[in-house]
């Protein structure tokens, strides 16, 4: 065999090995991309479940209309989610909760199971659980306002939540907690209506969720080869 032929064979083998590695990396990245899309969808489902729970005790026409729209969006997203990687059983439980919007604890159990499913695939559990604490504060304050004030049991739940969230360094969260404590939690008669409670804290919840989504997208891009990164 001539030197030229040997060099040609060696180059062909090296090229084949390189192309195989590129194909493997490309496939792995496609799989990772699909899983990130599924996680992002789960975070949207989490947001909608928390909203549906927070709207569940409200009877105002605008709140009922928004709750119906949230329920329709949830049903559609869960149908789409079933075709994505890492499916879960949220859709089956949601079918029952859709008809019982005031079932606060039922929503909370479903949300906890969704957060656990997310945490199994990506280390987002702590951020999602803190987000859920804030969303639960919103929902319980709506409930307290709707029923004309806190029962001792409800006040104890809210006080425990506020204490747990009190360690959060977010100044805006502390301000909102103070307003809810004065206006609902420790007030003999609520000074904030259910829609006001819901509207007060929803922007903070949405902002925190966006932060989790952006972190997930950023982390997924860090593993990309330069040629695969957008821009």
Where are the model-predicted features located?
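Hydrophobic alpha-helical segments
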Residues: 2-231
């Amino acid at each position: 065999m001539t030197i030229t032929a040997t060099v040609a064979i060696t180059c062909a083998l090296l090229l084949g090995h390189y192309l195989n590695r590129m194909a493997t990396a490309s496939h792995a990245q496609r799989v990772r991309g699909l899983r990130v899309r599924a996680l992002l969808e789960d975070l949207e489902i989490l947001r909608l479940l928390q909203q549906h729970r927070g709207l569940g005790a409200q009877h105002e026409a605008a709140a009922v209309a928004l709750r119906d729209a949230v329920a329709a969006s949830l049903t559609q997203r869960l149908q789409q989610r079933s075709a994505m990687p890492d499916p879960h059983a949220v859709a089956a439980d949601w079918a029952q909760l859709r008809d019982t919007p005031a079932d606060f604890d039922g929503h909370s159990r479903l949300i906890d199971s969704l957060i656990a499913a997310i945490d199994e695939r990506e280390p987002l559990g702590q951020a999602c659980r803190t987000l859920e604490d804030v969303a639960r504060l919103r929902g319980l304050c709506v409930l307290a306002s709707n029923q004309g004030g806190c029962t001792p049991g409800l006040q104890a739940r809210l006080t425990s939540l506020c204490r747990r969230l009190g360690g959060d360094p977010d100044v805006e969260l502390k301000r909102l907690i103070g307003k809810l404590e004065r206006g609902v939690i420790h007030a003999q008669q609520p000074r904030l209506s259910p829609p006001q409670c819901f509207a007060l804290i929803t922007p903070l919840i949405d902002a925190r969720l966006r932060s989790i989504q952006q972190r997930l997208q950023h982390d997924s891009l860090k593993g990309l080869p330069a040629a695969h990164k957008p821009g």
